[in-house]
A protein has these predicted regions:
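Canonical tetratricopeptide repeat
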Residues: 69-72, 103, 137, 144, ...
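Terminal, low-structured helical/coil segments at or just beyond the last alpha-helical repeat
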Residues: 22-28, 190-223
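Helix-start (N-cap) detector for alpha-helical repeat units in TPR-like alpha-solenoids
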Residues: 29-30, 64-65, 98-99, 132, ...
Length: 223
């Protein structure tokens, strides 16, 4: 009986060790795939990265960084339908995640689904106000929502967003250029020319083509 008890204890202990090892492997494998995928991204091997990230998410769907890396990889391989599917999944898992909503908004904007894009950017802005606006991409939440408003000719709505984006990123010539277009379309030609001049000073040479005819037609003094 003692020998049997010793054997049983040994068997149970060994089983626990094996199960413990299996548990560790189950935890480590998706992380290993993620790390390998990130190395692939750094080396420009985006197709391999996508496959590894999809495998990692299947094993463990609750690691946020996997979806962020997938956004980078799929954007380079143009696998947007896959990316969209997984970002929607991520949005359901990670509540009030402004960055994920922003990336989803970008997909809708590229699909010319501007109302859905505006909705996602609005969520991103709302969550960023809770999570903190020190994240480097927050200015783009406002910039991209403003761009959507501009594309659907709701120019008066775009101007406050462009203005706030400039508060967060004051040296962005593209924002000045687009706010200038919004000003022009709302009849504010002087403000438009000021923005285009500023954009030009920041390296956006195309603004000269916008600004010069307006100055000539409107008799606005050059500065």
């Amino acid at each position: 009986m003692k020998k049997f008890n010793l054997f049983l204890i040994f068997f149970m202990t060994t089983s626990r060790l094996v199960l413990g090892q299996m548990d560790i492997n189950a935890v480590n494998k998706p992380v290993e795939l993620l790390n390998s995928a990130n190395e692939d991204i750094e080396n420009g091997n985006y197709t391999d990265a996508v496959q590894k990230l999809l495998a990692a998410i299947r094993l463990e769907p609750k690691i946020r960084e996997m979806y962020l890396s997938l956004n980078t990889a799929c954007s380079h391989t143009n696998q947007i339908s896959i990316l969209k599917q997984y970002l929607i999944k991520a949005k359901a898992i990670f509540e009030e995640d402004d960055e994920i909503c922003y990336y989803l908004g970008n997909i809708y904007q590229n699909e010319n689904n501007f109302q859905k894009a505006i909705a996602e950017y609005s969520l991103a802005i709302k969550y960023a106000q809770k999570n903190g606006e020190d994240f480097e991409l927050v200015y783009a939440y406002y910039q991209n929502r403003a761009s959507c408003y501009l594309k659907i000719n709701e120019c008066s709505k775009s101007i406050p967003d462009f203005t706030y984006a400039l508060k967060l990123n004051p040296d962005n010539g593209a924002i000045y250029a687009n706010r200038g277009i919004a000003y022009y379309k709302t009849g504010k030609k002087t403000e438009a020319c000021k923005d285009w001049r500023k954009a030009q000073s920041l390296g956006n040479s195309e603004c000269r083509n916008l600004r010069t005819p307006v100055l000539q037609i409107s008799n606005i003094p050059r500065r």
